[in-house]
């Protein structure tokens, strides 16, 4: 894409803002080098990567911090004779450690993760990273353990240091030299241990003078007894440097052997830093990723100019920039300084950003065609050097790019045809738009030409729009109204900017004389458009309020239903407990449960306004339902399991949350394949022996221990009342934690006779078989 186009759209400024979110200088440079892609498949991949980066960044799965630019290191690694210095090795170690952390974070991504796949495919400098981590300390120095030679020589250096400190202390003490010294310590000068002697005691301490302090008050003297030790220390220092050089050569060799892996890892880190910067930019202006594909319509919802959006939430007015699938052109009209040019630049800039794999400040559901080319005719393009007027410069530019314009092109025309005779300029502008449409190109044009305004309303495939203004103040509102044209209100703009009133009155008289005063008509159109916008906003607000009320009613109904279910379950448990304690006989318990079920039905109908009626009964055929099938109880909006059915009564006995009750067919509906959940939690289904009244199965997989305990107790209680002797509890394998909790609960339950892990063909250690007393 032409650099001229990107410059006119201020695309480099967006890249500068993007670069500000990068953690490293290499990534910032990569951000500034981004541009529109010519490959739709590559763009789709980049968008998928950005979607994953947004999720990872928001989940704080990986945090980017600054890392050095190691690009110059690769030239060193290409030469067999060159060795990386310590600073270069530290920089390389820092980069590879960040890559290791990135691999750890992104390597866990599973399934269709694009980033996870990229990390998996990227060659990894495993040996180099491990060796650098082993040899380099947190202070940036080579560790003693880097090599046996380095360890040995440093041990001796430390030993000599201790020897010197001991000898100096004894020397000062024996000679009572404390008052002669500036400080009671040994220091280093010229890489040798010396004593800081006061200048006025010069000659009192035999030795070699190495240096003077800046004030001249201190003389640094090496006592003769330290000369031999210092000489040995210098030898060891040389040996240390040689040992360090051998370690650095070894590490350089490893990096050289793995230079392809090092380079790939570094590129991965930089690329991901760029991705995280894109994600940060997206969050900064509340953006999204539009769908970009051949044949998609221009649809940018709540679009804002990115530079204005980044300036603050109130700095940009959101616009819906839309064309129908059969439309290719947008003609924007309205007042000077009303926002027409910003509207065009927003469309072009957001298209360039989307084609570059960047997020755009627009709403969800936005889309764009895949533009291979964007051409811009924007603002004052006159060239004094080439002796070209604005009109001539635009024509020359259009002539140059005209052969390249096709169906994959977006053209932006700002006041095209201005700067010459108005009638000829308008005719030329219409002809250019015709030619662009004939080539299948997309275009957006801003104009003041009346002929082009009428063209926008009458030409098939073209949509007209105008920038609205406040009728009272004549100031622009920077809002776009579609399918109408607007006035230029040049006189009002001139008045706003201080032109003398007598000139404006004279201009108005000339308008009346020429018969060109259409201001009242356009004012009326603007008022109607503004009223329509306000009405649409009011309707949207009213709908939102009504939806809120409906949702609140639904929430209240659900709370009431849940509360009632919990009360019924507690009553049922109380009946079971009294029956187990012998305070209630079997028949009395069954009657009490029947009363509870009746209360459940009555209060359910009261909450929901009664059963569903005849229509529901017709819609649901009870004859095709079998025991064990899942159904929806519409009056409760709950899924239950059919236990029995009575075709004569047109009712079914349904288990909901461990409570069984007869439900009229009018209150039943197909469950759409959803599993039934007891109490909104455990899935309860019959076993093969259910028809004989021998067993039930409950599925507790995925539940927390406290929820599973509640569901299991209710399940066992219900089974006891119904006379079941054998149960199956599905808890899954997993870590075994839920199985242990289930076994603990069963062990403590007074009505459980025994339990054991199911045979392998019935579920193995993922299921427990239970026998009740």
Curated annotation (Swiss-Prot):
Gene3D superfamilies: 3.30.1370.110, P-loop containing nucleotide triphosphate hydrolases. It comes from the Bacteria. Endonuclease that is involved in the suppression of homologous recombination and thus may have a key role in the control of bacterial genetic diversity. It is an enzyme of class 3 (hydrolase). Residues 698-773 form the Smr domain. The keyword DNA-binding applies. ATP binds at residues 334-341. One of its GO terms (molecular function) is ATP binding. The keyword DNA-binding applies. Belongs to the DNA mismatch repair MutS family. MutS2 subfamily. InterPro entries: DNA_mismatch_repair_MutS_C, DNA_mismatch_repair_MutS_core, DNA_mismatch_repair_MutS_sf, MSSS, MutS, MutS2, P-loop_NTPase, Smr_dom. This is Endonuclease MutS2. Keywords: ATP-binding, DNA-binding, Endonuclease, Hydrolase, Nuclease, Nucleotide-binding, RNA-binding, rRNA-binding. Its EC number is 3.1.-.-, 3.6.4.-. Homodimer. Binds to stalled ribosomes, contacting rRNA. GO terms for biological process: mismatch repair; negative regulation of DNA recombination; rescue of stalled ribosome.
